[in-house]
Amino acid sequence: MYTYMEYLQKCFYKTTNWNEDNIFSNITATSSALLEFPIPNGCKVDLSSKATEHSASSFTLSNYHSINGSLAYLYSSIPLRNTMGTKDISLQDAISGFKMLELNSSTTNALQNPVYKNTHDSLLYGRMYFPGSALEAMIIKRISPQTQLLIKCINNPHLDKNGTMIVYLQKNAPKLSREFIYSTNEALFGFRCLYNMGSSESNLNRSINNSNLIPKFDNSVISIGTEIWYAALSMSPGLSTAFRYSTRSTSTGKPLTMTFACNPILGHISSAYTVKTSVASTFCSKYDFNVFSYASNLSLGFEIYNYSSSNTSNSAATPPRIKNSDSQVLSNNSTDSKGTVHIRSPDVLDYKNHSNVIISPIQTFDNYYHINPTLLPSTKNEFEEVRPPPLESQVDSNNETAMTAFENLVNESDFSSVIKLSTSLNDKMLKLLWKGRCKDFLVTTGVKMILNPITNTPEFNRFGISFSYAC
C-alpha cells in the first residue's frame, strides 16, 4: 500500500512524463509487490490533506509499543491535478501490484499529457518524527526532460555522524537509462544502467499480419541491467545484474513478466514468474538459490480483487443487450399463424445500412425453396457494401485491440477490496493482507505467521490494522 506522500510522488512522475519502470531498482518491483508486501504492526492512523494543487500535508499516529507519529509536508512546483482522495481513488492506484510495462511509456505519457512543457520542475518533501528528533527529506529536481537529480537525507542521532545523504543523478531514456549514485555512508559510489530491447510498432503490426489465427505473444520488452558499487572507506565492491522479460498475449491481452537476478560475489540467483491470470487475479512464483551454500527457497504469492457491490448489482440487473441491427431484423420480419418467418423486401429493410447483416436470397415457402430476386445484388457496388470485410482484417483488428481492451478493463474496473497472500517454504512463513474501503477510509489489516523451529507450532509474528484518509 502506498502512503499518500508516495502517491503524490507517483502523480508528480506521471505529470512530468517520468517512467519509473525504466529504472534498474524497479526491475523486480512486480514480484516484490506480490511477495514482499509489508504487514501493519499495531494500530496506525494516517490523515492527509491536499491544501492546494502545489502543497499537501500528512499526519501519522501509531501505538506500537509506545505512542509515536510523524508530520510530513510536500510541495510541487507543478500543479498536481490528477490526484484523488481516499474516497475516489481506485485500488489499482493505491496498492502496489502488477504493472503492465510498455517500451515507450514516456512517449505515451507525453501524448496523454501534452500540457506539460518539460520545464525545470521540482518536488520538495520533508517528514519529522516524534518523540525524538529524527528527520527525513527528499528533493527532486528536473534538469531536462530525461534527466533529474534526486537527493535523500536522513537525520537521526542514532546513526553514524547523525545522518546520511544519498544523491542520484538519473538519465531516463526509453532505450537506455543510467544512474550515478553517491552516499555519504562509507563514501559509497554506485552506477546503474538498464537497456531495453523490444519490437517496434511496425514489427508488431507485421508479426500480427503473419499470424492470423495462431495465438502468440508479442509486444515484448526485454530489459537487461546491472549495478556496480564501491565503498571507498571499507574498500568493499558490489556487483549484481538482472534480466526482465515482459510480454502480452495478442489473443487474450493478458500480460506476464519474468525476471532473473544474479549476484556473482555472493553467489545468489533469483528467478521470478508473474502472470495476470484474469482481470481480478495475479499469481507470482519466485525461486532463490545460492551456488556457494546450495541453499534454496521457493516463494508463492497471489492477489485477488473483489468487485464492488454496486458494480456487481448493476451488471446482474442489466439484461443482455441486442444489437440495433439484430433488433431491427426481428422487428421487420413477420411471422404467420403457422410459425413461418417471412423476410420482407429490401425496400422495407434497408440492408445497405446494415453491413453486419447478411440476408440470404434463398427462402422457403410451403416446404419449397425459392430465390427472391429482389434480395440479389443488382450491381457490384451494392454487393461490396453488403459483403463483410475479409477474415484477415477482422483478425488483425481483434489482435490489435485485445491488449488495449484488457488493459482498459483492468484500469476501469471498480474494486472494493483486495486480498494478498504469500508464503515461503524455507522461511516457513505465511502472510495475509486485506485492503478495502470503509466509508471514506482505506483500511488495511494483515497477519504474519511463522512456524516455531523448536516446537513446530504456528505463531503470530505480526498483526495490525491501518486507517488512511486523504482529501
Curated annotation (Swiss-Prot):
UniProt entry keywords in alphabetical sequence: Membrane, Mitochondrion, Mitochondrion outer membrane, Transmembrane, Transmembrane beta strand
An example Pfam family from this entry, by short name, is MDM10
**Bias kind Polar residues: ranges:** 325-338
What GO biological process, any one, is recorded here? mitochondrial outer membrane translocase complex assembly
Record text about domains: Lacks alpha-helical transmembrane segments, suggesting that it resides in the membrane via beta-sheet conformations similar to those predicted for other outer membrane proteins and porin.
- What does the record note on quaternary structure? Component of the ER-mitochondria encounter structure (ERMES) or MDM complex, composed of MMM1, MDM10, MDM12 and MDM34. Associates with the mitochondrial outer membrane sorting assembly machinery SAM(core) complex.
Q: What does this protein do?
A: Component of the ERMES/MDM complex, which serves as a molecular tether to connect the endoplasmic reticulum and mitochondria. Components of this complex are involved in the control of mitochondrial shape and protein biogenesis and may function in phospholipid exchange. MDM10 is involved in the late assembly steps of the general translocase of the mitochondrial outer membrane (TOM complex). Functions in the TOM40-specific route of the assembly of outer membrane beta-barrel proteins, including the association of TOM40 with the receptor TOM22 and small TOM proteins.
Q: What is this protein called?
A: Mitochondrial distribution and morphology protein 10
Its source organism is Debaryomyces hansenii (strain ATCC 36239 / CBS 767 / BCRC 21394 / JCM 1990 / NBRC 0083 / IGC 2968)
